[in-house]
């Protein structure tokens, strides 16, 4: 699955942003407001967040080590053979991609001072493609990603901030006629998938759940014969 990475400068007017100092809080607010104004002011089709640099570095390191995985998405209950309602799940295949580290926008002298401990160089920008597992199995590299997450690292060295942008793929009819209409994924599902990415790729704490998610990620890559899809379902529900 190949995508064309859109530069951050094509989304935010960095020249205007550089006209005066901005704090991380101000940039985060601008990022949120921009995406809330999309799709005729509904914000549909996009999700966004601001990620501290140290958090991103941890996730990126895990993504480089384990660049693919599958995460469960809860679905409406269905009846089993006995007529009992049973929770259903849909699996999504995710793939990390890593791109050239962006240069720090100039003139950097006009930026507010970066947080203590922030590196003088930017990390790599990264993307995560999420596709229904059945779609990926049937079409592999030609499969259509339903959600594309991009972690923009342009402001990492100046503000210790990573800007996350999620783009939900519109349906064919929507793309042709009404871009703000229908999408292959709901806003709620896009948020849940993003949360699942964080749960499996950002290890923190010492709980059994954290250890098991770590073990599942390792088994998926290193010992696939020990990997059990059923174990993923324990981590499907939002916290």
PLM regions with names:
Residues 235-239:
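Long, charged/polar, low-complexity intrinsically disordered N-terminal extensions
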Residues 1-96:
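Charge-rich, low-complexity N-terminal segments
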């Amino acid at each position: 699955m190949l995508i064309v990475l859109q530069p951050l400068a094509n989304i935010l007017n960095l020249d205007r942003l550089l006209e005066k100092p901005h704090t991380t809080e101000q940039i985060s607010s601008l990022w949120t407001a921009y995406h809330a104004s999309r799709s005729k002011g509904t914000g549909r089709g996009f999700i966004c967040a601001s990620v501290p640099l140290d958090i991103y570095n941890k996730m990126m390191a895990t993504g480089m080590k384990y660049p693919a995985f599958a995460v469960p998405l809860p679905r409406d209950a269905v009846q089993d053979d006995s007529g009992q309602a049973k929770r259903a799940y849909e699996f999504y295949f995710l793939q990390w991609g890593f791109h050239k580290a962006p240069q720090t926008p100039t003139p950097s002298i006009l930026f507010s001072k970066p947080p203590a401990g922030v590196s003088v160089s930017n990390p790599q920008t990264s993307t995560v493609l999420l596709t229904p597992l059945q779609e990926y199995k049937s079409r592999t590299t030609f499969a259509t990603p339903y959600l594309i997450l991009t972690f923009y690292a342009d402001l990492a060295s100046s503000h210790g901030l990573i800007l996350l942008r999620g783009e939900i793929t519109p349906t064919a009819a929507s793309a042709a006629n009404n871009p703000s209409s229908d999408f292959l994924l709901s806003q709620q599902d896009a948020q849940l998938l993003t949360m699942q990415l964080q749960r499996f790729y950002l290890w923190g704490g010492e709980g059994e759940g954290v250890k098991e998610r770590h073990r599942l990620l390792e088994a998926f890559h290193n010992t696939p014969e020990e990997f059990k899809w059923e174990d993923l379902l324990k981590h499907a529900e939002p916290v």
